[in-house]
């Protein structure tokens, strides 16, 4: 199995262990909503653009609501477990495009409420999570009021985004990815002027 496939399987296992109306870190979405999002992203090519393009967002939301309301929970989750269909561009892009998607949304369920801890990850998974950090940071922090530098505890710089005084975000690749994706539930340390750090946090365009 690829890292993306393992992360998908882990996500599905966690989603099966909670009720579909359980909360997530995605504001306004429960687990069923999040599952419908994953299905629409991979299986409804007509609606997927609205996930990233605001002009199409209303249509995407309507399709997602329809998919969520009309599909049995086990069937909905089964479609996520099955992965992208043959006609989906994600079939070929799965090893690249879905590592971050599956990791982030799995943690969106795991990290709700107090007491969460990062999952132990093998070296292959940690390595696979390094690459998406730069892409995510460019998407969410391109207008940041600071030069935001993402570093591992070992001193490797994985991404830089924004302009201005430096703010350093330090953590393991998965934690950096969660922070870049707009989640406050990330085990990172942030070095910079306190007011600037708060402005950087608010500047993130969460996905």
Language model: regions and residue ranges:
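An N-terminal domain-cap segment
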Residues: 1-50
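Structured surface interface patches that mediate subunit assembly and partner/cofactor docking
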Residues: 3, 17-21, 44-59, 75-207
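Generic alpha-helical scaffold signal
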Residues: 5, 25-28, 67-70, 96-99
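C-terminal end-helix/capping segment
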Residues: 57-70
